[in-house]
Regions:
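Active-site rim/loop-helix segments in enzyme catalytic domains that contact anionic ligands
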Residues: 1-106
């Protein structure tokens, strides 16, 4: 496994990696890279307007839906390693604990 090339995608919101670099991810998967996607936030506030319009929606349900969407997209792209840091949304702050989580991923 040590000889396998790796790629790291850092995505501010759970779905950003798909439309910002889905093609690059697919290409790297095809080239046998081990791709890791790190989602800093679920985008539960600024990226989830349609979900919030549904009856009975809660913050927990929005996050679960966004996680499921991102996981499905990662699966479609062949990504086996997707990490969700759940750092919040609007504001998204990278405090010391969050920085340490990123260092662990890198």
């Amino acid at each position: 496994m040590a000889d396998r090339k790796t790629a790291l995608v850092i995505s501010a919101h759970a779905a950003d990696f798909v439309w910002r670099c889905g093609g690059a991810i697919a290409l790297h998967q095809e080239l046998n890279y081990e791709v890791t996607v790190a989602c800093l936030s679920f985008g539960e506030k600024g990226e989830s307007a349609k979900l919030w319009k549904q009856d009975g929606m809660s913050l927990t349900k929005v996050k679960e839906a966004r996680k499921d969407e991102a996981q499905a997209a990662a699966n479609a792209l062949g990504v086996n390693d997707i990490r969700f840091l759940d750092l919040g949304d609007y504001p998204l702050r990278l405090d010391q604990v969050a920085q340490e989580k990123m260092v662990d991923i890198i």
